[in-house]
């Protein structure tokens, strides 16, 4: 389906951005290298080679310092990125010579023949595109400090940075794919709307958040409460309501008939496995309600069934009846 793992990741990123209706211009680093978009910036890095090395080398172990080079040539035979020491350079032509196990390799740094080590690459992208704001995980804070220095060395101000905390599981431990603790963004979007996830992310952006299954129903109910509350608020208070920000100033108007937690109980007690059956039970309490008139509730019926099937039903334990109960 994809030509490379990188292309797969790019498509996943675009899919995520589209789900949340981000306006974006996608730029492939590989294509930018090959098309020469980075050429001027690469020549600038070569021009400032000694200054860049003075920033990076003190952060490396002694053994690594002997072989480190910010430029990584692409092997003409295999197409693989080579991490080998630099012997010579020509700052005017952009040609550099590397030592590949005793063999000298001459390479141009232009048009995709070389890539940069990532901390230098990060700064080079900021320099190229005049990036003025960059978000990154807390674990990249030290790298961002180095890239800021390199960007200044190249001749431009680095972007304003925003370091965010990483997600934790219900025990307060880091989420790990190998452990399978916590839930993924994809799972959240199976159990609840993108807007509920936006609401979850909205408060305290610099604080570590616990991300596990039980958080979803609670957040959905908070979202429903905020949507309903918005309609009766004065304008100055509406702006303080998180759904104003989640919906870019235009939150939906829908009366909340039942919270998500109640809907989950209804799924469990009715044993409904599709939203049509669930709506029949809803109509027992609210006869005149129709799915088309309550789009939020209608979407919640599907989310509730998915959540119940995945997170509640597998953990249900039934008591064995006693002889009297039989």
Give the location of each predicted region.
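A structural signal for well-ordered alpha-helical segments within the folded catalytic domains
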Residues: 7, 11, 36, 141, ...
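Hydrophobic alpha-helix feature that most strongly marks membrane-spanning transmembrane helices
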Residues: 1, 152-155, 201-202
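Catalytic adenosine-cofactor/nucleotide-binding cores of aminoacyl-tRNA synthetases and other
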Residues: 139, 165-313, 317
